[in-house]
Every structure is written in structure tokens, then in C-alpha cells.
Amino acid sequence: MLERVAVLYNPLSDASIKLSRELTDWLIARGIKTRRGVSQEFRDQPQLVADCDLMIALGGDGTVLRAARLCFPHNIPVLPVALGHLSFMAEIGPEEVYSGCEQIMNGGGWFDERTLVRAQLWRNGQKLGQHTALNEVVISRSDISRIVNVHVTIDDSPLTTYHADGVIVATATGSTAYALAAGGPIVDPRSQALVLVPIAAHLTNIPSMVLHEDAVVTMQLRSRHHALLAVDGRENIDLIEGDEVVVRRSPQVCTFVRLRPSNQFYTQLVARLRRS
């Protein structure tokens, strides 16, 4: 039963703003306590989200990623609603949001648990930080004219040193995002496997790889010039030579609410790729 719902909208999208207002009024009229806001507001006041039963994310995949960041620490499920964008995370559009909410209010739908990855940044034996991603962790060049040298180890076994524009470690969910654009394989999102994808690699015969779910991937920067660490397209942390980023599956998951059968993924995938 839904008692409290958070509605996340994109402040740069008129369609998202309009639908968020209308949906909030619709939910309140049905006796559901509803909090409407943008990601910054919910980050600054996490108590607004912590006791919610559901977050509805209105926008593209960027909005869904922001919703995931807000919700997974509290185990709150997310209902993604795509607004005119090519989306691999959302299965319904604005025309279905009200019937979808009614379906959820009546006990329908199912929970789709997606794998997260955790990345730890180490420098000279000291852990500098820890970050969690739904899509991917990326080491990339910070200078457009230079490539980076990234030494990759999997489960303590050296793999190779990529001379590339960057290296991606993605989840199955992220396999249809940056990793796909870089030439990586598409992995069924129900899988817990990880994907290793070099970005425009030079002089290497090691292609993209699908790794087992408990793989531990260590990426060490071996370039004298700086590089950047990005987590789901955010953070952009400066890296220096010798820095290590250790990526493994997180014990936490991101939960989406789905209204269609799980076997619809491939049908939706083909439709989305045809539109891209």
C-alpha cells in the first residue's frame, strides 16, 4: 500500500515540471502524502525521502540515475517514467503514469533489483573515497590530446595495460549506456555480471569482456599526466599516476518498480535501438 510518495522532476524540462505538478495533485487527491522536488532539494533534505514508499522519476535516464542515488541507501523503489527520451531504464511514458500508479496502489507490479558497483579510490595505500554506481565507473583522459595508460587486474590476476581514451567497468544496467557507445556488449539487466570495456584502445588485442558477478577489477593509472574518475557520469575526480580504483559489486541494489512482464526487455531493447 502506498502512503508516501516522492516525485522527482527535471527542472530543465517543461514537460517534467508540468507532469510533476499534475501527478502530485492527483496523488494527494487520493490520500497519498506526496513530496515533489528536484534532486538537489532531496539531497539537502534526505529526510524528505527516507520514509517514502516509492519515488516516481519523471525524465530521461539522467533523472533516473539521480533518483537511484537518492533511493538505494534507503531501499526505496523507483518508478521511472520516460518523457520523450530514448530510455533503457523506463518502460512507461506519461500517458501510462496514472494507470501505472493505480496498478501499484492496488498491489500490482513487481520489483526489479539491479546490481550496483562500488568503487574505492586508493592513493599511496590510503583510501581517499568510496562511490557507488548504477551504470558505470570510468577512468578517462583529462587532456583531449593524450591517451591514458590504465593497468587492469582482475581478481589479482594481471590482464593488460590499456593505452586508450579510457576504461569502463559497467553493470548489466550500464551495458546499454556509455559502455554500449564504446563498443561493449549488451547484457541482460537481470544479470549480476560486470562488463569491462576499453574506450578507443590502441595496440591491444584484449577486447571488451563480460566478468563474473564477484569479480574485483583494479585499475591503476600509469600515465604521468592526470586522468579523471567518473561515477555514473558525475564526480570527475582528478587522478594522478599510481592511483588505483578498485571496483566490485556492491551489497546494495537499486530497486525499480515494473508493470510489464520481465520478458519484455528484448522487445523494448529492439524498439529503442531502432529509434536511436
From Swiss-Prot:
NAD(+) binds at D61, G62, R66, N135, E136, R146, H163, D165, A200. GO terms for cellular component: cytoplasm. GO terms for molecular function: ATP binding; metal ion binding; NAD binding; NAD+ kinase activity. InterPro entries: ATP-NAD_kinase_N, ATP-NAD_kinase_PpnK-typ_C, NAD/diacylglycerol_kinase_sf, NADK. Transmembrane segments: none annotated. Its EC number is 2.7.1.23. One of its GO terms (biological process) is NADP biosynthetic process. PANTHER family: NAD KINASE. Its main location: cytoplasm. Belongs to the NAD kinase family. Gene3D superfamilies: Probable inorganic polyphosphate/atp-NAD kinase, domain 1 (3.40.50.10330), Probable inorganic polyphosphate/atp-NAD kinase, domain 2 (2.60.200.30). The keyword NADP applies. Its cofactor is a divalent metal cation. It holds the Pfam family NAD_kinase. This is NAD kinase. Keywords: ATP-binding, Cytoplasm, Kinase, NAD, NADP, Nucleotide-binding, Transferase. It catalyses: NAD(+) + ATP = ADP + NADP(+) + H(+).
